[in-house]
């Protein structure tokens, strides 16, 4: 049996230090994971994310009585060690959804651009009012749905803003991770974002408890 890529979190009483330690652990585990992938491995994971993610978004749209051509979805453009979500965003666009990707501003603010716009023209934070599904990055998530991010505070700022702007309808937030990155507990503060579900290549979309 192969060893787990991430250990069980053992709190030390210093959440700031614990977060720094865990971010280092997750980043190292990601490098180890993707360094071992062949091109076929990466393609298989990308396809799994695309199929499962698209199906889940389609089902969400159907429950809301909407076609995908009326949906706006936030996503992200992954770095090398992040889950390969490019095929998913492409599939969403091909199905008619509008896909927004973040533009990093001064901490902790994000602007947004339409992925279909090659110039990535900023649309302003108010565009979040149009979002129907939020697919977001992260480093790990607890079984309770507490997200560990990169440390910039961008999504801890953005998600409350999203929920305020879409208060009349519940916008689901799904973090996209590698298969090993759901753990019993992560180091967390009260302000850390809580998500509704996780999308992974091996499991598809799985709801997380509160």
Placement of each model-derived feature along the sequence:
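Surface-exposed, charge/polar-rich loops and edge strands
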Residues: 1-22, 28-35, 40, 125-134, ...
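Mid-sequence acidic-hydrophobic segments that form the walls
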Residues: 118-121, 137, 161
């Amino acid at each position: 049996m192969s060893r787990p890529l991430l250990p069980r979190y053992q709190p030390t009483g210093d959440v700031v230090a614990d977060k720094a330690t865990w971010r280092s652990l997750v980043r190292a585990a990601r490098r180890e994971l993707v360094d071992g992938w062949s091109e076929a491995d990466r393609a298989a994971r990308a396809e799994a994310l695309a199929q499962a993610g698209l199906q889940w978004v389609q089902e969400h749209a159907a429950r809301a009585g909407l076609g995908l051509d009326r949906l706006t979805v936030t996503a992200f453009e992954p770095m090398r060690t992040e889950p390969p979500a490019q095929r998913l965003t492409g599939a969403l666009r091909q199905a008619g959804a509008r896909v927004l990707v973040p533009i990093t501003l001064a901490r902790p603010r994000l602007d947004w651009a339409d992925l279909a716009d090659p110039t990535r023209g900023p649309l302003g934070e108010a565009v979040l009012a149009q979002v129907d599904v939020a697919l977001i990055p992260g480093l790990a998530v607890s079984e309770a749905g507490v997200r560990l991010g990169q440390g910039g505070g961008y999504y801890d700022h953005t998600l409350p803003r999203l929920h305020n702007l879409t208060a009349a309808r519940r916008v689901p937030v799904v973090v996209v991770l590698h298969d090993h990155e759901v753990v019993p507990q992560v180091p967390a503060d009260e302000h850390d974002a809580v998500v509704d579900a996780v999308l992974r290549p091996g499991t598809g979309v799985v709801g997380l408890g509160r």
